[in-house]
Amino acid sequence: MSNLLVLNSSANTGESVSRILIDEAVNQILTAAPGTDVVRRDLGANPVPHLTTANLAGVRGTPSTSEELAARALSDELIAELKAAGTVIIAAPMYNFSVPTSLRSWFDFVLRAGETFKYSEAGPEGLLKGKKVVVLTSRGGLYSEGPAAAADFQEPYLRHLLGFVGITDVTFIHAEKIGFGPEARAAAITGAKGQIAKVAQTFSTVAA
């Protein structure tokens, strides 16, 4: 079994639904495929810095200052983790209809020309083909269908970013309406855990 990269992005380190779900997913996968190597990156507790004038050249240029060199070293580290992973699990709560800025910053540091994608005469080409990603979302309302679906800037955004680097095997598991009260929250978690169990079964097949 190849490496599993686990990305938490919730700023809530307490009873975060997305953290509950990602812990469930990791436990289920390790049960199905005990030999899996897990690399954890908690972007909520230890966020990747935002791109600024001081560090931009470290990711999108030629680094020279200490800030730029530090940004390049972090970018290299994050990209190495991603390249080594056969599967990535992302816990992504919906913040203001999109993703936490900590997750956005992670993408800013790993989407690097020549490393995770390249430009050609035909346009950009992703260099990370063959990987699998499972995205676990938590949402206060219902955005997968109905009138609020037009306000879902989370799933389309993540699908596009992942597709840009060549990752098209992406599964989304949504825990929705968690803001509708305790019963709705519990039902959303239970439903998402059921979907996680089905996804985890595929890992035992791969491991075999």
UniProtKB/Swiss-Prot annotation:
The UniProt catalytic activity note for this protein reads:
2 a quinone + NADH + H(+) = 2 a 1,4-benzosemiquinone + NAD(+); N,N-dimethyl-1,4-phenylenediamine + anthranilate + 2 NAD(+) = 2-(4-dimethylaminophenyl)diazenylbenzoate + 2 NADH + 2 H(+)
Fetch the InterPro entries from UniProt. Answer: Flavodoxin_fold (IPR003680), Flavoprotein-like_sf (IPR029039), FMN-dep_NADH:Q_OxRdtase_AzoR1 (IPR050104), NADH:quinone_OxRdtase_FMN_depd (IPR023048)
**Residues that bind FMN:** S10, S16, V17, S18, M94, Y95, N96, F97, S138, R139, G140, G141
On cofactor binding, the record's note says:
Binds 1 FMN per subunit.
Q: Which GO terms describe its molecular function?
A: electron transfer activity; FMN binding; oxidoreductase activity, acting on NAD(P)H as acceptor; oxidoreductase activity, acting on NAD(P)H, quinone or similar compound as acceptor
**What cofactor(s) does the depicted protein rely on?**
FMN
Q: What SUPFAM superfamilies does the record tag this protein with?
A: Flavoproteins (SSF52218)
User: Which branch of life, at top level?
Assistant: Bacteria
Alphabetic keyword roster: Flavoprotein, FMN, NAD, Oxidoreductase
Q: What is its EC number?
A: 1.6.5.-, 1.7.1.17
Does the entry feature the keyword NAD, yes or no? Answer: yes
Q: Which family does it belong to?
A: Belongs to the azoreductase type 1 family.
Please give the subunit comment from the record.
Answer: Homodimer.
**Job of this protein:** Quinone reductase that provides resistance to thiol-specific stress caused by electrophilic quinones. Also exhibits azoreductase activity. Catalyzes the reductive cleavage of the azo bond in aromatic azo compounds to the corresponding amines.
Q: Write the protein's name.
A: FMN-dependent NADH:quinone oxidoreductase
Q: Record the organism.
A: Hyphomonas neptunium (strain ATCC 15444)
